[in-house]
């Protein structure tokens, strides 16, 4: 899952003291998120269930963030009764559903394709603001929407009878819609009467997701034996990677660290600048999956991917 499909809600950019530093931080975050897809796909290909990996990611990230917030901002540990419903929506539909559906999609689609579909979430948000909230929309947003739609059709090779796996495509669409709820509920939280900083908001979102998974898949039934093996990654030679090490990457370097870097970068960048750097994630993810997993795009699909990213970028910069 990515958290960079659009600039993080509630993170107001401070005066830009160092734009290069901001770009570097956001690029590192995008790269870590990009590698996370390949690592997660490898873990799932070696016996760890999609839902259980989602449970491990949410629970592990919650524990790490809880320890951090307890050290630096103990007041943020307090949850007021009025914010519980919104935090529940944010955590269950925004966090848990986005992660699980993205993981499901990459078990059946190329990682780059899944991310391209998920990255169209800002366009759906723009449609919601236009038709749901009746906000005016610039013509460039409609051009961007048309470009992204055409690009997705090219990536799916619809003229050849739609070559993408139907379940994988449906899961990616579901992840995209869940990501829309993630951004809208987060935005409502940080602008409403119970405002939170982005770190504690993410912590409680992960906490709500972890609680959801604990009820849906109780820990006492966890198949711990699936974490005891090793996994071979095609592009790393004959190295056998311990599954717990790869899961640790998904939790720490694939979730907590890149999110923190993204938050720090927003102290130096405007949202429009950050959105440009965020567009590198599917590009980097596709390159990593090509090298490590052998996933490839045809030249026509690459052209479609460029059209999708161009459309998203055009719409983002004209919202």
Residue ranges: model-predicted function:
Residues 2-5, 65, 69, 128, ...:
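Hydrophobic transmembrane alpha-helices of multi-pass small-molecule transport proteins
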Residues 2-56, 161-191, 209-215:
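Glycine-/small-residue-enriched transmembrane alpha-helix faces in small-molecule transporters
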Residues 61-80, 94, 147-163, 207-243, ...:
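Membrane-interface helix-cap regions at the ends of transmembrane helices
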Residues 18-22, 47-55, 79-85, 157-178, ...:
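Juxtamembrane helix-entry segments on the extracytoplasmic side of multipass membrane proteins
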Residues 2-13, 58, 157, 243-245, ...:
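C-terminal-most transmembrane helix of multi-pass membrane proteins
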């Amino acid at each position: 899952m990515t958290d960079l499909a659009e600039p993080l809600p509630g993170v107001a950019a401070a005066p830009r003291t160092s734009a290069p530093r901001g770009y570097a931080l956001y690029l590192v975050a995008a790269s870590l998120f990009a590698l996370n897809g390949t690592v997660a796909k490898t873990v799932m290909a070696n016996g760890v269930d999609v839902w259980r990996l989602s449970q491990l990611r949410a629970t592990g990230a919650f524990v790490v963030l809880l320890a951090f917030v307890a050290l630096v901002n103990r007041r943020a540990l307090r949850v007021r009764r009025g914010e519980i419903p919104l935090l529940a929506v944010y955590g269950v539909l925004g966090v848990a559903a986005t992660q699980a559906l993205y993981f499901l999609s990459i078990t059946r689609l190329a990682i780059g394709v899944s991310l391209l579909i998920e990255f169209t979430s800002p366009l759906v948000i723009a449609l919601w603001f236009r038709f749901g909230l009746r906000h005016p929309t610039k013509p460039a947003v409609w051009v961007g929407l048309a470009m992204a739609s055409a690009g997705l059709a090219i990536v799916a090779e619809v003229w050849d009878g739609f070559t993408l796996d139907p379940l994988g495509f449906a899961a990616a669409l579901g992840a995209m819609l869940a990501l829309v709820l993630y951004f809208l509920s987060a935005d409502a939280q940080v602008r409403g009467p119970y405002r939170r900083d982005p770190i504690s908001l993410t912590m409680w979102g992960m906490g709500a997701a972890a609680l959801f998974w604990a009820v849906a898949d109780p820990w006492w039934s966890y198949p711990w034996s699936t974490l005891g093996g090793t996994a071979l990654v095609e592009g790393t030679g004959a190295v056998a990677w311990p599954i717990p090490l790869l899961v640790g990457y998904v939790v720490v370097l694939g979730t907590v660290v890149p999110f923190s870097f993204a938050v720090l970068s927003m102290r130096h960048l405007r949202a429009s600048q950050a959105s440009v750097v965020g567009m590198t994630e599917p590009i980097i993810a596709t390159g990593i999956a090509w090298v490590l997993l052998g996933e490839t795009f045809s030249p026509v699909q690459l052209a479609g991917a460029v059209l999708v990213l161009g459309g998203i970028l055009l719409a983002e910069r004209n919202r």
